[in-house]
């Protein structure tokens, strides 16, 4: 079982983090962190201003900290099972990943600093060699026969994709894995 967590609209999605994870048969608490989908950051509108990215970060931290408190009260670890930020300027294809890399770096560092409380995290989403069918288009919705890019069919393909050649993002992940592996060493 996975849970997005309360999201900014818990009554809309009918999520209650404590109730959803309170069962003795659930071993850990899960949340998602989606600043763009939740209206905390619009890389296209802001052109990725540092101020707007910082707002997204602060909103994410407040959201995570609230989930950490619930997880601690349930004596269960927290897993951020999905966290994401689009490519710079909201591009689905091409474009740099400097904003996303900065956000991911902060996310990994912040969560790794909470051993015993935060057990892990997963980014969204691996596309590898997959690409939207029209690389020149701003937004391409999946259709049968299209490559899988990690994004669900109803969302723009490549929106949140990490491609095989996104070397700087891969470096962020390598550092993140290293930070979390320290948890195992006590």
Predicted regions and their residues:
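Extracellular glycoside hydrolase catalytic/binding regions
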Residues: 1-117
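Aromatic-rich peripheral "rim/lid" segments of glycoside hydrolase catalytic domains that contact
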Residues: 18-25, 59, 91-106, 110-186
């Amino acid at each position: 079982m996975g849970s997005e967590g309360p999201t900014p609209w818990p009554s809309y999605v009918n999520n209650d983090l404590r109730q959803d994870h309170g069962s003795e048969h659930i071993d850990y608490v899960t949340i998602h962190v989606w600043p763009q989908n939740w209206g905390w950051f619009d890389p296209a509108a802001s052109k990725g201003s540092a101020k707007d990215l910082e707002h997204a970060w602060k909103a994410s931290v407040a959201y995570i900290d609230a989930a950490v408190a619930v997880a601690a009260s349930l004596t269960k670890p927290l897993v951020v099972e999905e966290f994401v930020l689009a490519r710079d300027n909201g591009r689905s294809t091409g474009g740099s990943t400097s904003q996303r890399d900065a956000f991911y770096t902060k996310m990994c560092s912040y969560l790794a600093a909470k051993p015993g409380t935060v057990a892990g995290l997963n980014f969204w989403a691996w596309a590898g060699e997959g690409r939207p069918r029209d690389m020149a288009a701003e937004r391409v919705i999946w259709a049968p026969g299209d490559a899988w890019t990690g994004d669900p069919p109803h969302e723009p393909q490549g929106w949140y994709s990490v491609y095989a050649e996104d070397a700087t993002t891969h470096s962020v992940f390598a550092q993140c894995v290293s930070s979390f592996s320290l948890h195992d060493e006590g």
